[in-house]
């Protein structure tokens, strides 16, 4: 029996990484918000790898922090090992990754939600939506509670109509033995949304006491770890270590011998999994001649003996998992605490969404995270924040926040999803950005804090601190450009030691810093007037000076991008009857309904010739 359970401005379905950011954003922007989760013990859960960040993903976390999100702060309060990845490459691809204490992270996020003003956290399964005049007006729980709302964010993760598969055993379940979310996916399909099914998987967990780490390679954290959040003042500490081991030919032989028992290859699993996080059986099938694959053995926390075997994701039967694990160095006697499994779940075709992440068909309905076809905690958090902010802005009668590709990785992620769509779980990578030298993780505050400040999620004090930081960067660059250093035996000895040419007469400090062999700190002994600057300022100075030419070129590309994005397309345009467009282009443009010529040009199946037709049409139909 249904009953009236109350009224809220916004309901968020799901309290994973997307739902948390959506709920906090709405509440912090002054809207009465309710966040629903199937299980209160699963708030902020990490059902797969117990880590935050990684290549490309670390950029997302920094960007989210610059906008006013929570993930970076929670990570700094709960992570136990920090590593900066790709330090052997340029600064554009430097990405922070941190091992998290999984339970501490969950508890931290749950506490944050519980203490947030304007936000209620409730355990309930939402099984349907109510629409009034085609717009979201209520959500209904499995127990019959009806909550009147003005907007709703679906952040259902891998729970929606979920099915877990291990070997020939398949059953309805969410991740980690939680309930699956039932009813909602079927209703969304009946409302006209294009739904599909994706798959992901997770490796086994083993008992720390049963593994032999002496047979593995030690993977320590950075000597001087750096935090995720721009507001974290206390340097983080490394409190744990990880280990590296490998599969081998014996492991591969067992997997090959059980090929017909793999749900991925015997027809039990038909949905599409993530390309960049394949199962071990997929790796063996795809790379049959590769003699071994890396496996990282990572702690799930400081107060548990569970160890996560990154790289050993599988849906093979449990007995096969046991057999293959015992062939791996250091895991010969490992006790498996949780077997690996695959999980299928329902999600929406993201081309159903606007760049604000609002549904094109159902006003007031927003999607975020794996519901939108992405994979990963960080991708989910970024989308949850954008969906929550835009739900709040719409209800407040304010202009939406649309993050463009030229703004950063969150904008790139969303543009890829809503413009190009995806046929597999989407993962962010640095290679997806055309402007990655501009979109470094170190300058996310400069790029995005003005937006966070404008929407009210970055305080005046935070904003002014960032402005002061970049004033200091600019002042130091001016000083270095104007400061010369005379030739000396000590200077030239240092230059030769760094395998770069000595100077004759004198040289400007700025010219020396631009040499690839030298860094800002190398020149400190020859720069007595140097001011005492924080490490983040010194880093920004060095990057800007070394890459000035490349940065200038990418900024010109961004200006061209802005011109194309500024050519807006009317919402009422009739693509199906537009003469000159190819049939495929008509169909794609009508389906996606891009907001600008720039967005139209990125749609698969729309050619430069089709864009020329659009430009002619715009010229002929000027108001």
Regions inferred by a protein language model and the residue ranges of each:
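An anion/pyrophosphate-binding glycine-rich loop and adjacent beta-alpha core
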Residues: 39, 186-322, 419-492, 496-506, ...
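Conserved N-terminal/central alpha/beta ligand/cofactor-binding core
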Residues: 6-7, 24-128, 143, 151, ...
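Beta1/beta-strand and adjacent pyrophosphate-binding region of the FAD-binding site
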Residues: 4-18
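Internal hydrophobic alpha-helix adjacent to the cofactor/substrate pocket in enzyme cavities
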Residues: 380-401
């Amino acid at each position: 029996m249904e009953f009236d359970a109350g009224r809220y401005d916004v309901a968020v379905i799901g309290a994973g990484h997307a739902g948390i950011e959506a709920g906090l954003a709405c509440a912090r922007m002054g809207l009465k918000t309710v966040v629903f989760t199937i299980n209160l013990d699963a708030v902020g859960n990490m059902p797969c790898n117990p880590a935050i960040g990684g290549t490309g993903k670390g950029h997302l976390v920094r960007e989210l922090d610059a906008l006013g999100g929570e993930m970076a702060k929670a990570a700094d309060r709960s992570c136990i090992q920090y590593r900066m990845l790709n330090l052997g490459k340029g600064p554009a691809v430097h990405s922070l990754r941190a091992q998290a204490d999984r339970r501490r992270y969950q508890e931290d996020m749950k506490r944050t939600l519980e203490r947030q003003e304007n936000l209620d956290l409730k355990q309930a399964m939402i099984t349907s939506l109510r629409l009034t005049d085609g717009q979201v007006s209520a959500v209904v729980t499995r127990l019959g509670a009806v909550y009147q709302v003005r907007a709703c964010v679906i952040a259902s993760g891998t729970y929606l109509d979920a099915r877990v598969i291990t070997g020939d055993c398949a059953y309805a379940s969410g991740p980690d033995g939680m309930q699956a979310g039932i009813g909602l996916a079927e209703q969304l399909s009946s409302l006209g949304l294009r739904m599909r099914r994706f798959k992901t998987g997770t490796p086994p967990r083993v008992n720390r006491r049963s593994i032999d780490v002496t047979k593995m390679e030690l993977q320590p954290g950075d000597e001087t770890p750096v935090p995720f959040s721009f507001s974290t003042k206390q340097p983080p500490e490394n409190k744990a270590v990880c280990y590296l081991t490998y599969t081998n030919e014996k492991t591969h032989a067992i997997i090959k011998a059980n090929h017909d028992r793999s749900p991925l290859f015997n027809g039990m699993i038909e949905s599409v999994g993530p390309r960049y996080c394949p199962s071990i059986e997929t790796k063996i099938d795809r790379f049959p001649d590769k003699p071994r694959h890396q496996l990282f053995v990572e702690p799930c926390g400081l107060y548990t003996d569970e160890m996560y075997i990154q790289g050993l994701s599988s849906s093979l039967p449990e007995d096969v998992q046991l057999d293959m694990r015992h062939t791996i160095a250091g895991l010969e006697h490992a006790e498996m605490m949780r077997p690996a499994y695959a999980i299928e779940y329902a999600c929406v075709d993201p081309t159903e969404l606007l760049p604000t992440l609002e549904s094109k068909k159902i006003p007031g309905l927003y999607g975020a995270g794996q519901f939108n076809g992405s994979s990963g905690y960080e991708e989910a958090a970024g989308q949850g924040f954008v969906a929550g902010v835009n739900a709040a802005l719409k209800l407040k009668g304010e202009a939406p926040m649309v993050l463009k590709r030229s703004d950063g990785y969150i904008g790139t992620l969303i543009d890829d999803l809503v413009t190009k769509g995806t046929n597999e779980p989407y993962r962010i990578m640095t290679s997806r950005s055309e402007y990655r030298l501009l979109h470094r993780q170190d300058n996310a505050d400069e790029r995005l804090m003005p937006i966070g400040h404008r929407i009210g999620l970055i305080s005046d004090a935070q904003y002014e601190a960032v402005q002061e930081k970049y004033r200091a960067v600019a002042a130091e660059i001016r000083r270095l450009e104007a400061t010369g250093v005379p030739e000396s035996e000590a200077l030239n000895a240092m230059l030769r030691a760094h395998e770069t040419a000595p100077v004759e007469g004198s040289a400007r400090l700025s010219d020396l810093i631009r040499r690839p062999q030298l860094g800002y700190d190398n020149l400190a002994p020859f720069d007595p007037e140097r001011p005492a600057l924080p490490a983040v300022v010194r880093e920004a100075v060095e990057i800007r000076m070394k890459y000035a030419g490349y940065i200038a070129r990418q900024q010109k590309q961004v200006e061209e991008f802005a011109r194309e994005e500024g050519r807006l397309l009317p919402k009422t345009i009739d693509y199906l009857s537009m003469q000159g467009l190819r049939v495929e282009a008509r169909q794609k443009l009508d389906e996606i309904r891009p907001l600008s010529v720039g967005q139209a040009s990125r749609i698969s199946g729309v050619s430069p010739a089709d864009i020329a037709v659009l430009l002619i049409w715009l010229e002929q139909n000027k108001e």
